[in-house]
Amino acid sequence: MRVEGDDQALTGIRPPQIGETAVSKPTTQVLSTSYGRTIEATRQVALVVGASLFVALCAHITISLMPLTPVPLTVQNLAVLLVGLLLGSRRGFAAMMLYLIEGAAGFPVFNPTGPGGIVQLLGPTGGFLIAYPIVAFLAGYVFERGTRSFLRAATASLLAEIVLFTGGLTWLYVFTHSLAKAAYLGLNFFIAAEVIKIMLAAGIASRWRKLEERFRAAE
């Protein structure tokens, strides 16, 4: 039995054709949003993992200063500054926490002059290593809050280095029981090198941000 008006109600309704799916527009939008979030989360994880491996690679570019000091000359500190400046405070912190976990688990990510693993974390250079997450966080935090110029990047790097050496020298003091000896072993040999690292980190980070801004403006 046909009810009057049924034909009018059905007018304009087209059944799905071959190859089409009857998925509503809101559902498609939800799926698209979910997919986009998954891709973004994957990208963020990849950045954090890649940053931890970058620091591990730089840790192997090391010059031993034994028997003068157990603390080696390495570009690892420069890598940590760059991770904080370029990835930002939160991702930089996460990357350095992952780096410490990798090292504590026995992966060869620490500088090769030490024994590796937990032993190296608890050794004379452990204070520097344990400070890395805070160093990366602080560098990123200061750099994020400003014009992201060379001067701000240099300031962020300097403050981060102060935290790094405060942690490192405090840990060395536990071993030496002497502030003078801790400073001799952990600071005196590295002042000039750290100034160069600060300048390099600031130059790279500020230049990178300018390139990012130009790229976004061109889109």
Stretches with model-predicted labels:
Residues V23-R37, R43, V49, L57, ...:
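Short helix-perturbing small/polar motifs within transmembrane alpha-helices
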Residues P16-F93:
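Hydrophobic transmembrane alpha-helices
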Residues T69, G146-E219:
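Membrane-embedded alpha-helical hairpins and interfacial helices in multi-pass inner-membrane proteins
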Residues T62-F137:
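Alpha-helical membrane segments and adjacent membrane-interface helices in multi-pass membrane proteins
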Residues M1-T21:
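N-terminal amphipathic/basic-hydrophobic helices that include classical n-h-c signal peptides
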Residues F54, C58, T62, V83, ...:
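Alpha-helical membrane-inserting segments
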Residues V45-G50, L78-L82, F93-L98, T125-I130, ...:
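Hydrophobic alpha-helical transmembrane segments
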Residues M96-F107, T125-V135, V142, S178-K181, ...:
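Juxtamembrane/interfacial segments around transmembrane helices
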